[in-house]
Amino acid sequence: MAALARIGGRHLKSVCLINSSASCFFTQRRGVASKLFIGGLSFCTTEQGLSEAFSKCGQVVEAQIVMDRVSDRSKGFGFVTFASADEAQKALMEFNGQQLNGRTIFVDYAKAKQSLGGGGGYPIARGPPDPAVIAATRTTETSKSD
């Protein structure tokens, strides 16, 4: 039997079993349990430096700093993925609010990526309508008013 698949208006990626622990639900609601969001990074922090700093808490699978596409400069945040959820939790407890490269960093569990839904709700521009379609529409509107 499955537990609630939709809570608070948000769909969960997978569903916990009823007899499983509550941490299963919260892990899935947050996103990936072994991936951490790191905010407040210095612009001089590198992916290698981030990986080395967080490797004190466990095996770092990936360290990523998000870059601006235009300027190719750090946006000041990134992600660190650990081999296990326990290592990620240890890093969260140890690094949140601490200094790294002269800046206070903020650590939290990464959230699942949200779908943008095809351009934010704006229609796709397809050019002017075909004249035949306009004529057919006018003919239909005229016949309805008769």
From Swiss-Prot:
Pfam families, per the entry: RRM_1
RRM domain segment(s): 34-112
Tissue distribution: Expressed in rosette leaves, cauline leaves, stems and flowers.
Stated induction or repression of this protein's expression: Induced by methyl viologen.
Modified residues (Phosphoserine): 42
Signal peptide positions (record): none
PROSITE patterns: RRM
Subcellular location(s) of the protein: Plastid, Chloroplast
Gene3D superfamilies: 3.30.70.330
Biological processes, Gene Ontology terms: positive regulation of response to salt stress
Annotated GO MF terms: RNA binding
UniProt key word Transcription regulation: no
Protein name: Small RNA-binding protein 11, chloroplastic
Transit peptide interval: 1-31
InterPro entries listed in its UniProt record: Nucleotide-bd_a/b_plait_sf, RBD_domain_sf, RRM_dom, SLIRP/GR-RBP-like
Keywords for the protein's UniProt record, in alphabetical order: Chloroplast, Phosphoprotein, Plastid, RNA-binding, Stress response, Transit peptide
Xref: PANTHER family: HETEROGENEOUS NUCLEAR RIBONUCLEOPROTEIN 87F-RELATED
